[in-house]
Swiss-Prot record:
The protein, known as: Cadherin-related family member 3
Location in or out of the cell: Cell membrane
Protein function: Cadherins are calcium-dependent cell adhesion proteins. They preferentially interact with themselves in a homophilic manner in connecting cells; cadherins may thus contribute to the sorting of heterogeneous cell types.
Extent of Polar residues compositional bias: 805-817
Residue stretches of biased makeup (Basic and acidic residues): 749-763
Extracellular topological segments: 20-711
Residue spans crossing the bilayer: 712-732
Cytoplasmic-side segments: 733-831
Gene Ontology MF terms in the entry: calcium ion binding
Record keywords: Calcium, Cell adhesion, Cell membrane, Glycoprotein, Membrane, Repeat, Signal, Transmembrane, Transmembrane helix
UniProt cross-references to PROSITE patterns, sorted A to Z: CADHERIN_2 (PS50268)
Length: 831
């Protein structure tokens, strides 16, 4: 920086004419230490250049002071006059700071001409008064424990810039003398007497002065506070020692106030701490105020207080939480009994059931066995009972003697009595138990007395016997009749009905059902007059106490509900084409029966299949036996074209009915099927093959893509089975290894108990084809003339008579298949 200033100066000199320069500089000036701000240090002026260019505002200024400082600045007085003053930013201290500063004054005008000169400022020494350092300069609080022996309290120290640096001692003294304190010349504060907190001042204010060699002084304040120590025992000030407390006072109720004082803390009672030293959960003490409050329910009538109502406590007062001084006092509380428990009972509701024939004067209930009063002292624990009340109970129940709580019966309890029925045979009695002492607490007792009915009357049916008629065609659930049994006893108990005997048929163990609640008799299935026309039943009724029975006769009224049944039901006949008219075809005879119709009531007619009316029956009515006759000859050259006739024969049981009654009467019709084959004139010898049955079994495996889950499940099951077998093999190998690695001594006992093998019965699923072996038709072989029997449903045939046993014919192969249009030949099933 100094090199830059020199360059500027040379530039100004070489610019031509008389140069800008500072007057009265360089120079040396003095300034006193601790000079205040704006203190004049030196004045100087500026000689302008020939051009008279003014000094730039802000110049001259101090640059590069040595040592560096901000304690000085240049003030402008006029255009050419200036002064150097102190700034106050830094304290000029002769003893601790620089004693001289070299200030370079730099000036510059508008045309750039500059000049630099040096001002040397010397700091001069000034005698300063001594100073107290730190918090001592602001005043100091000193604490002295009471009853401390007289002696040293504190060492006061001050600083003087001149004397301290030259090791000249300062002088200390008390500006305000005290008989309790003194101070030495070197600044030591002593106490001259023993200080007592309770007897004298609690604190002292001292003014301490210090003087240097130039007689300059300084002072500071000392406050000496006497610290109280705990040297006095607290004293109880409450005179009372016995207190009476009513029981059941609310928790937190103040029952006593213990007060005490401590001479050490006179005027500050809140500094004492109270506590209860004896073990008691009934009371607690506020440790700050000494008030004793109820901490637990005071029940004079229960627990230890019922035996001993006196509670003794020891109260301790201390002047600090731990250590210190303490005092103790014994106080006593007497818990007084009050009438706080109403007379009560272990049960407040009673239910009594009495037989209806209970005698008057019977003791029903003694309330004294259930009621009590928990109060501990008389008269609080005495009680009595009020007069019983309740609708309808005044003439039936009372106390004997009055107020004793002994309830006795005084009226009639007949269950069937209308007045008793009006109240439902239930009597609600209310009686109150109350205290004998104020405030006369009461509690209500409710007694419900129920009359238990007794079985006085038998259970009887309304009639000694019952007779019902029912037509045989009535369906199941048809109501036949109703029986009813009653009991004069109240309450009415439900009667349960049952059929104990009778009513069985060949197919059913009982065709009758009786409603167990209503006694209504119904049909389970249709009855059959022809099988059983009269049923005699025994119906039993019970109400849980009694049992009674009655005979019920059910007449099954007959109706025409059976169809005529004829034999044979199906028949096959073969006749030659030239059979004579009026011939009984193959001596065929039809025999019919009807369970509910006479033989003369049958009428025969041919329905479908009698083409051109070639066939008729004789007789066609009035008999149960008829024959099939040829009514007209066959003419295949003209109208006839059918060779096989399937005749549906109707047998009706209305022959005896007139035209007016036939429309209203029940008519049944049976049917018979006849097969007649007309045999043409033979041109060659016809051999009749033996009848046989050919079975063709065809098996075919077809795979459907929609059944993908079948192989998937099979595969998954196989994998799981293999995994299970593998795990079992591993477990087996481990078990064998453990067994083999153990002792080789033969075990006396078997490792496992032998299990009983269970016999497994395998059920074989057999698919059988049941052939109908009933041969219900006969026919004549037109070639041999022999008679054979046949089954109309399966087509099976067998020879009748000595040809029953036939030799076995070779069976055709099951793989044989007939050609198109070839019907399988039935297999002979002769027996």
């Amino acid at each position: 920086m100094q090199g830059a200033v020199i360059v500027l100066v040379l530039f100004g000199i070489t610019s031509g004419g008389e140069a800008l320069h500072l007057l009265h500089l360089p120079a040396t000036s003095n300034v006193a230490e601790n000079a205040p701000p704006a203190t004049l240090v030196h004045k100087f002026s500026v000689n302008l250049s020939v051009s008279l260019s003014p000094v730039i505002p802000g110049f001259p200024l101090v640059v590069n002071p040595r040592p560096f400082t901000e304690a000085f600045r240049v003030n402008r007085l006029s255009a050419t006059n200036f002064e150097v003053v102190t700034t106050g930013k830094e304290q000029l201290d002769f003893e601790r700071g620089p004693k001289a500063f070299d200030l370079q004054i730099y000036v510059k005008d508008d045309v750039g001409v500059t000049d630099v000169q040096v001002l040397t400022v010397q700091v001069t020494d000034v005698n300063e008064p001594p100073q107290f350092q730190g918090i001592l300069a602001q005043g100091l609080n000193l604490y002295v424990i009471e009853r401390t022996n007289p002696g040293f309290i504190y060492q006061v120290e001050a600083f003087d810039p001149e004397d301290t640096s030259r090791s000249i001692p300062l002088g200390y003294f008390l500006i305000s003398p005290s008989k309790n304190f003194r101070m030495s010349a070197n600044g030591t504060l002593f106490s001259t007497t023993e200080l007592d907190f309770e007897a004298g001042h609690k604190s002292f204010n001292l003014l301490v002065g210090v003087r240097d060699s130039g007689n300059l002084e300084a002072s500071t304040a000392l406050q000496v506070t006497i610290v109280n120590i705990n040297d006095e025992t607290p004293r109880f000030t409450s005179p009372r020692r016995v207190y009476s407390v009513p029981e059941e006072v609310p928790l937190g109720t103040m029952v006593a106030n213990i007060t005490a004082m401590d001479p050490d803390d006179e005027g500050f009672p809140g500094r004492l701490l109270y506590s209860i030293t004896t073990t008691s959960s009934y009371f607690m003490v506020d440790q700050l105020t000494g008030t004793i409050q109820v901490a637990r329910r005071l029940d004079r009538d229960a627990g230890e207080l019922r035996q001993n109502p006196i509670i003794s406590l020891e109260v301790r007062v201390r002047d600090r939480p731990s250590g210190g001084q303490e005092n103790r006092m014994q106080i006593t509380f007497i818990v007084e009994d009050i009438n706080d428990n109403p007379a009560t009972c272990r049960k407040l509701t009673f239910s009594i059931m009495l037989p209806e024939r209970t005698a008057n004067g019977t003791l029903l209930l003694d309330l004294n066995k259930f009621c009590f009063d928990d109060d501990s002292e008389a008269p609080n624990n005495k009680f009595n009972f009020t007069t019983p009340s309740g609708a309808g109970s005044s003439r039936r129940f009372s106390q004997h003697p009055a107020g004793s709580g002994r309830i006795v019966l005084t009226g009639d309890l007949d269950y069937e009595n209308p007045s008793n029925l009006a109240v439902g045979n239930v009597y609600n009695v209310m009686i109150q138990v109350q205290d004998a002492a104020p405030p006369y607490y009461k509690k209500s007792i409710y007694i419900s007395i129920l009359t238990r009915p007794e079985n006085e009357f038998p259970l009887i049916f309304e009639r000694p016997s019952y007779v019902f008629d029912v037509p045989e065609r009535r369906p199941a659930r048809t109501q036949i009749g109703q029986v009813r049994a009653t009991d004069a006893d109240f309450p009415r108990t439900p009667v349960v009905y049952s059929v104990s005997r009778g009513g069985s048929s060949l197919q059913y163990p009982n065709i009758f059902w009786i409603n167990p609640k209503t006694g209504e008799l119904q049909l389970i299935t249709q009855a059959d007059h022809e099988t059983t026309s009269v049923y005699i039943l025994t119906v039993e009724a019970t109400n849980g106490e009694d049992r009674s029975s009655v005979t019920v006769t059910v007449n099954i009224l007959g109706e025409n509900d059976e169809k005529p049944v004829c034999t044979p039901n199906f028949y096959f006949m073969a006749i030659p084409v030239d059979l004579k008219v009026g011939t009984n075809i193959q001596n065929f005879k039809l025999t019919c029966t009807d369970l509910d119709s006479s033989p003369s009531s049958f009428r025969y007619s041919i329905g479908s299949g009698n083409i051109n009316n070639h066939f008729t029956f004789s007789p066609n009515a009035g008999s149960n036996i008829t024959r099939l006759l040829l009514a007209s000859r066959f003419d295949y050259s003209s109208l006839d074209t059918v060779w096989d006739y399937q005749l549906l024969v109707h047998i009706t049981d209305d022959n005896l009915l007139s035209g007016s009654t036939k429309a209203k009467a029940l008519v049944e019709t049976g049917t018979v099927t006849l097969s007649v084959k007309v045999i043409p004139h033979p041109t060659t010898t016809i051999t009749t093959p033996r009848p046989r049955i050919t079975y063709q079994i065809r098996r075919e495996n077809v795979y459907s893509t929609s059944a993908w889950y079948v192989p998937f499940i099979v595969t998954l099951g196989s994998i799981l089975l293999l995994g299970l077998l593998g795990s079992l093999m591993v477990l087996l190998s481990k078990a064998v290894y453990r067994h083999c690695s153990s002792t080789t001594r033969r075990d006396r006992k078997p490792l496992t108990k032998k299990r009983d093998t269970k016999r497994m019965n395998r059920e074989a699923m057999v698919e059988s084809i049941q052939m109908n072996s009933v041969f219900d038709g006969e026919a004549v072989d037109p070639v041999t003339g022999e008679i054979y029997e046949f089954n109309s449903k399966t087509g099976a045939r067998r020879w009748k008579g000595p040809l029953t046993q036939l030799p076995n014919w070779p069976e055709p192969s099951t793989q044989h298949r007939g050609t198109a249009g070839e019907a399988p030949v039935p297999k002979h099933t002769g027996r």
